[in-house]
Amino acid sequence: MSETSWNEQFRNRTKKLAIAIIKAFSSWKKTDEIRIIGKQLIRSSTSVAANYRAVCRARSDRERYAKLCVVVEEADETQFWLEILVESDLIKIEEILNIRQEVEEIVKVMTTYKYRLEKNSTQ
């Protein structure tokens, strides 16, 4: 697979994640806690998608690395908010199992990509 098609595939994947989170949030009971945490979750997940797009359009390796750091940070924050929702018994894990798995995979892939980019820039 070429780098361009991989980037396109991952852009779509991060966007689908953000959309899945928005749809999940819209189906949850709107308590104050869910509203507050849900909005944070939407912000972090849409930031993953938006910043990955920026990674693909970076003008230099430095810029690509900086944006990739943001993607990893925001994806990790997305994981955090999902954990908070489940561990505080606001939603059941079954409601977001697929989303949690997808976020975990994105964190792993982006962290690996970040380390490879960092390693290549120091050689």
What name fits each language-model region?
Residues 1-123:
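Amphipathic alpha-helical assembly/interaction segments
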